[in-house]
């Protein structure tokens, strides 16, 4: 009898066969599932602490997605030859998995939970993110932890006006949509997508299609749990202290209501801090008088937060003004300024209410492209977008340094929004980096980065296909009543039920990201949200077009200029030289950057037009072919007894035989030539070995013949 209680479930899912198994590997984890999709294999494990740490007032969930290089038959680079810090792709995939799982843990569950997914084998055609999400969901389901899952997931492409389930990498490249959707049997929880200006109904159709198609994976997880699941934890939320809730409400409700009449964020935040401090102080007085221990501040803070949420949500559902005084459809005031930084290639300051982004675009050459060493192979990115949000943006102090997961995620969302509207490399040969510095934040800073990024690119002279704007939507849902909010504030994001970000042009959507905190979002609600988002997007696009009608026709004087020439691919080695000596000297002496592709396309970039012209001339000389009959101005390199070696072009020499210098007999070559002397010669012969024979007397004879023909006949 086997020592393993192994359970396997297999199902056909679109183009792919999927295998789930549990009970053999990682048995000491709370839950472990291996997912195999056509040789892309992941191991998802879950460990949950049996009790919460004392005083814990939030849910400590961590999700780590780790790609092992052995999965693709590779050995890692670097001195230690082992995997190092997570790549950007691993960080983004960890976030992708975290987002639909987090809302499904019950309220009040504060035990630490860690989800770790290892990629063990990779089929280059099958991305590992969807198997990883399915595996994490299945591992949680079999673990017995309190989890209101399982979650299913699907990737959807849109090719030839038809949806494609879980496309291969080649299909994704050919698609006008790359959308990932995750959800439960009844509801969608998360959407992440990049699109090529698709209409809202196509985007919504893709979400619905993906949700329908993921049900087979959810059914398979249910079957796996029935046969291989562990007993459910006997966990119950701590009973609510109704007396404490009533006392806190009595003390703070009126003051919290007054705080939310303040329209300025800083004033409101100050007032809320005062209310929190005063309430805690009063409760400590009560406890001292009664001879008891006061409730801890975390518990009181959670009660106050719940009161805040009820106040804000009821005001909005009752049709009252929002926190800052707007109605549900109004976008905050917008101010736009471009060309704000004098020596950058392109810049824009985009301000929407109390959210502000200073965005800078920089143009570079092919050598500046980012090289990505992915499991499926190395590739290059010509467009980079980086998002930074320092603590001062929210009036706080904090750590400044390498980007956190949130910053990496926001940067990728803004990049997705803009990338489909960039010109192709053939139309605009530069590599492009956009950096969004968030200088103020009160909600929707990633969408401010989209707007500011588009404006900075246009200021830099990048011929965008269209203006791109982004907007963040929110939702308040109570029973059958709901309100969709346009351009949400940070507080509305925290207190609401949905964060729904849409970016696009006047023609359609380029990026859609949705995170839902509750079950029960219907197709109709998403339809309303998309329609209202389009209305807000069009308003912002109008403001952007008024400020900047199109891309600058002139690049910044500080941006590199580029010229392209074509050379014979067999001559590439001549331009590069031994150990790179020739190209290194070229770039240093002309002040240019030179990139050479395998097909012989040479790109020369520099801020100096003179330097570019010189580099172009020298490359043309290096790659030029010596032709018989051509006349060259050469330099005598070396004198021999029987002639002279003359340099015609860089790296190309010829022999001027002693008999070809002048018509009369030459006794001593030193009487006619010196090393370093400039001499005009004609190519009279080349052979199959590349040897070149030159003549100076041929030019003398031609000159004599020409002068004789010009002499008038005698009478």
UniProtKB/Swiss-Prot annotation:
Cystine pairings recorded for this chain: none
Entry GO CC: cytosol
Residues holding Mg(2+): 493, 499
E.C. designation(s): 2.7.7.8
Domain S1 motif: 629-697
Main location group: cytoplasm
Catalytic activity: RNA(n+1) + phosphate = RNA(n) + a ribonucleoside 5'-diphosphate
Name of the featured protein: Polyribonucleotide nucleotidyltransferase
Species classification: Bacteria, Pseudomonadati, Pseudomonadota, Betaproteobacteria, Burkholderiales
Primary gene name: pnp
């Amino acid at each position: 009898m086997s020592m393993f209680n192994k359970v396997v479930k297999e199902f056909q899912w679109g183009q792919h066969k999927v295998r789930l198994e549990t009970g053999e590997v990682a048995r000491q984890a709370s839950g472990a599932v291996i997912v195999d999709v056509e040789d892309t294999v992941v191991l998802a494990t879950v460990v949950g602490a049996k009790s919460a740490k004392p005083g814990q007032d939030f849910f400590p969930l961590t999700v780590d997605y780790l790609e092992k290089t052995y999965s693709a038959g590779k050995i890692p680079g670097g001195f230690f030859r082992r995997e190092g810090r997570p790549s950007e792709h691993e960080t983004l995939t960890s976030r992708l998995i975290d987002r639909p799982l987090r809302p499904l843990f019950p309220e009040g569950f504060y035990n630490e939970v860690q989800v770790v997914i290892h990629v063990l084998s990779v089929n280059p055609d099958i991305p590992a993110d969807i198997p990883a999400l399915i595996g994490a969901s299945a591992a949680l389901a079999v673990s017995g932890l309190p989890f209101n899952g399982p979650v299913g997931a699907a990737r959807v492409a849109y090719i030839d006006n038809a949806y494609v389930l879980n496309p291969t990498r080649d299909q994704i490249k050919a698609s006008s949509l790359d959308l990932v959707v995750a959800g439960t049997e009844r509801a969608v929880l998360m959407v992440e997508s990049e699109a090529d200006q698709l209409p809202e109904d196509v985007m919504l159709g893709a979400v619905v299609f993906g949700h329908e198609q993921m049900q087979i994976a959810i059914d398979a997880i249910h079957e796996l749990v029935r046969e291989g699941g562990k007993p459910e934890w006997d966990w119950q939320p701590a009973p609510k202290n109704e007396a404490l809730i009533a006392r806190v409400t009595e003390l703070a409700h009126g003051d919290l209501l007054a705080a939310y009449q303040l329209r300025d964020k800083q004033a409101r935040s100050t007032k809320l801090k005062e209310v929190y401090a005063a309430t805690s102080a009063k409760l400590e007085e009560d406890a001292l008088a009664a001879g008891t221990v006061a409730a801890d501040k975390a518990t009181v803070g959670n009660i106050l937060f719940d009161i805040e949420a009820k106040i804000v949500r009821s005001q909005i559902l009752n049709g009252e003004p929002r926190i800052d005084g707007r109605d549900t459809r109004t976008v905050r005031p917008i101010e736009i300024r471009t060309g704000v930084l004098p020596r950058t290639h392109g810049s824009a300051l985009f301000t929407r209410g109390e959210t502000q982004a200073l965005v800078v675009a920089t143009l570079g050459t092919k050598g500046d492209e980012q090289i990505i060493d992915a499991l499926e192979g190395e590739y290059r990115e010509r467009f980079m977008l980086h998002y930074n949000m320092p603590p001062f943006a929210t009036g706080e102090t904090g750590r400044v340094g390498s980007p956190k997961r949130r910053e990496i995620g926001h940067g990728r969302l803004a990049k997705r929004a803009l990338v489909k509207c960039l010109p192709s490399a053939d139309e605009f040969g530069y590599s492009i980096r956009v950096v969004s510095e968030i200088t103020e934040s009160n909600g929707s800073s990633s969408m401010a980065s989209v707007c500011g990024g588009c404006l900075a690119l246009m200021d830099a002279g990048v011929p965008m296909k269209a203006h791109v704007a982004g907007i963040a939507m929110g939702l308040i849902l109570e029973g059958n009543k709901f309100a969709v909010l346009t351009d949400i504030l940070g507080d509305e994001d925290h207190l609401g039920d949905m964060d729904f970000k849409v970016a696009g042009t006047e023609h359609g959507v380029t990026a859609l990201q949705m995170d839902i905190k509750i079950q029960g979002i219907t197709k109709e609600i998403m339809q309303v949200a998309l329609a209202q988002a389009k209305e807000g997007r069009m308003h912002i696009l109008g403001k952007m077009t008024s400020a900047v009608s199109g891309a600058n026709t002139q690049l910044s004087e500080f941006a590199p200029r580029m010229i392209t020439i074509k050379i014979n691919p067999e001559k590439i080695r001549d331009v590069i030289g031994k150990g790179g000596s020739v190209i290194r000297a070229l770039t240093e002496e002309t002040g240019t950057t030179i990139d050479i592709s395998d097909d012989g396309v040479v790109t020369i970039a520099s801020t100096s037009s003179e330097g570019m012209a010189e580099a172009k001339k020298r490359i043309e000389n290096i790659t030029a072919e010596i032709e018989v009959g051509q006349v060259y101005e050469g330099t005598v390199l070396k004198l021999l007894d029987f002639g002279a070696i003359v340099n015609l072009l860089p790296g190309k020499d010829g022999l001027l035989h002693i008999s070809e210098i002048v018509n009369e007999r030459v006794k001593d070559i030193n009487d006619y030539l010196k090393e370093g002397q400039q001499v005009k010669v004609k190519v009279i012969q080349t052979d199959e070995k590349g040897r070149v024979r030159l003549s100076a007397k041929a030019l003398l004879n031609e000159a004599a013949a020409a002068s004789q023909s010009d002499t008038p006949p005698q009478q």
